[in-house]
Amino acid sequence: WGATERLVELGGRAVEGMSVAQILDRNNTAPRYQTFRQTYLDRFQREPGFGGVTAFDAANIVLEALAKHPAERNLKKTILALRRFEGLQHPVVFDEFGEARRDSLIMVVRDGQFVVVQ
């Protein structure tokens, strides 16, 4: 949670050039993310951050698991059996222990913004 907009806001110039690992690319152009982003902006009048994106992904994982196996009473078991879900920016894959695996990005703070290191 440390690499949020709040870090840049509070850190100011002191965090310029700082590198962080993140799962959220605020400039992602995927249609699924852009639709979510616009809906979020319309509703909250600000850009979605880490919390909004991961909460959306988590809710959709639960809803998809319930839709695919409505009679199953053990949600964790269902999620582990399905394993792979489409997130807003990249897949979310659960291992046998229930740990979520996502692609990570290396970002650097440039001009007060998080930018993906190519």
Enumerate the language-model features and the residues they cover.
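Extracytosolic ligand-binding ectodomains
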Residues: 1-118
